[in-house]
Amino acid sequence: MEVKAIVKDTGYSALKVRLCVDLVRGKKVSEAITLLRFMTSPTAKVVSKVIKSAAANAENNFQMNPADLKISQIYADEARMLKRMRPQARGRVSPILKRSSHITVVVAD
């Protein structure tokens, strides 16, 4: 049985989130949370919350044992970009792309 949790429009780019996501793919939920707790990246806190949410969904909705859960799929997709302009010399502008991402976690027993 697979249980999913999704967080949308995080304030971090998908590239930065994927650094944390790639470390915990395929690990047990408890092991992944302890691994993320000691990471210095601010994205680790968001990824940890999504993993905890998926584990809670499995426990409350499907009566699965949280100790047996393993992260079967985890990925970060690109979300919408906020486009801003920064003034430059000679009346020109250069774009600033504020990127965000969607994080999806699927746990299975």
Swiss-Prot record:
Record's keyword annotation contains Ribosomal protein: yes
Keywords: Ribonucleoprotein, Ribosomal protein, RNA-binding, rRNA-binding
Disulfide bond annotation, renumbered to this chain: none
Keyword Lyase in record: no
Any GO BP: translation
NCBIfam families recorded: rplV_bact
Biological function: This protein binds specifically to 23S rRNA; its binding is stimulated by other ribosomal proteins, e.g. L4, L17, and L20. It is important during the early stages of 50S assembly. It makes multiple contacts with different domains of the 23S rRNA in the assembled 50S subunit and ribosome. The globular domain of the protein is located near the polypeptide exit tunnel on the outside of the subunit, while an extended beta-hairpin is found that lines the wall of the exit tunnel in the center of the 70S ribosome.
Quaternary structure annotation from Swiss-Prot or TrEMBL: Part of the 50S ribosomal subunit.
Similarity section: Belongs to the universal ribosomal protein uL22 family.
HAMAP family assigned: Ribosomal_uL22_B (MF_01331_B)
Descriptive protein name: Large ribosomal subunit protein uL22
Organism: Dehalococcoides mccartyi (strain ATCC BAA-2100 / JCM 16839 / KCTC 5957 / BAV1)
